[in-house]
Amino acid sequence: MAFNLRNRNFLKLLDFSTKEIQFLLELSAELKKAKYAGTEQKTLQGKNIALIFEKSSTRTRCAFEVAAFDQGAQVTYIGPSGSQIGHKESMKDTARVLGRMYDGIEYRGFGQSIVEELGTHAGVPVWNGLTDEFHPTQILADFLTMQEHSRGKQLHEMTFAYLGDARNNMGNSLMVGAAKMGMDIRLVAPKAFWPEEHLVATCQDIAKQTGAKITLTENVEEGVKGCDFLYTDVWVSMGEAAEAWDERVALMTPYQINMDVIKQTGNPHVKFMHCLPAFHNDETTVGKEIAEKYGMKGLEVTEDVFESEYSIVFDEAENRMHTIKAIMVATLGS
């Protein structure tokens, strides 16, 4: 399968067809295999890439940098305090400046409209490293990881549940990705934390074409039954007020992934996924604060699940690099 994605932006999965997404997943697997075999070809030699981070990051930044270096490209990191974007210079103007200097631009920040504006005016490929609404590079990594742990199933044969805050960028993006790839997704969350109705409707329309099944439920037992994968994310996202914790913890505690929830799947081969970072113990500053305030050593997932044989979170994290590399190679490579 081969598609010409050269000079395309990668802003959200809604912009891509099922076959284009599958192509990117296949390219990711090929590039991963080549890296391990030491046979990787540098198709981005001589390219210059700008990485704009208005929100801090570990995995996304490292994945973009290593992927670029592996492919022979040079990168410039522009951090939260390292530019005039939105302060003295509009994104429209910034896009037109950087587009003259760089061959590709990554953006990680706030509203989806910002990265869309960047993509409209830059004149070079723009890649969404995360916005408040969508996190498309993460979904490619998730689906590659699912394929690697599928026990012979294709994506369209898989069932997975996302538990927790289903209205955040991960809930949105997993729903879109599942709809595109014909998967059975269950969004298991308090009703107030379901995705926006317009996005659900859009995904349901896509599902009619792909055979996907989208279920929104508040019932954990119903939502996880028969799942191949269980997925969660932090309960309070970057940029949200600290005051949100009390209400969020009270609402979300029933949706914690623990060993009881693992057993409720009825699947001894079920796997646990998380985009990271995760609050699974009290070994971080925030983790200690949570343990002291709420008497919980883990929030969205317990330590015994996170460190168990069910967990594939570090395979998932590594795959950020391989899938991001595929996006850059497909849209920018020679």
Swiss-Prot record:
One example GO MF annotation: ornithine carbamoyltransferase activity
GO BP terms: arginine biosynthetic process via ornithine; citrulline biosynthetic process; L-arginine biosynthetic process
Entries under PROSITE patterns matching the protein: CARBAMOYLTRANSFERASE (PS00097)
Localization (cell): Cytoplasm
InterPro entries documented for this protein: Asp/Orn_carbamoyltranf_P-bd (IPR006132), Asp/Orn_carbamoylTrfase (IPR006130), Asp/Orn_carbamoylTrfase_sf (IPR036901), Asp_carbamoyltransf_Asp/Orn-bd (IPR006131), Orn/put_carbamltrans (IPR002292), OTCase_ArgI (IPR024904)
Any Pfam family the entry gives: OTCace
Binding positions (carbamoyl phosphate): S57, T58, R59, T60, Q84, R108, H135, P136, T137, Q138, C275, L276, R320
Keywords: Amino-acid biosynthesis, Arginine biosynthesis, Cytoplasm, Transferase
Binding residue positions for L-ornithine: N169, D233, S237, M238
GO cellular component: cytoplasm
Catalyzed reactions: carbamoyl phosphate + L-ornithine = L-citrulline + phosphate + H(+)
Pathway per the UniProt entry: Amino-acid biosynthesis; L-arginine biosynthesis; L-arginine from L-ornithine and carbamoyl phosphate: step 1/3
Main location: cytoplasm
Domain of life from the UniProt record: Bacteria
UniProt keyword Nuclease present: no
EC numbers: 2.1.3.3
Record-stated family: Belongs to the aspartate/ornithine carbamoyltransferase superfamily. OTCase family.
Biological function: Reversibly catalyzes the transfer of the carbamoyl group from carbamoyl phosphate (CP) to the N(epsilon) atom of ornithine (ORN) to produce L-citrulline.
Name of this protein: Ornithine carbamoyltransferase
Natural source organism: Vibrio parahaemolyticus serotype O3:K6 (strain RIMD 2210633)
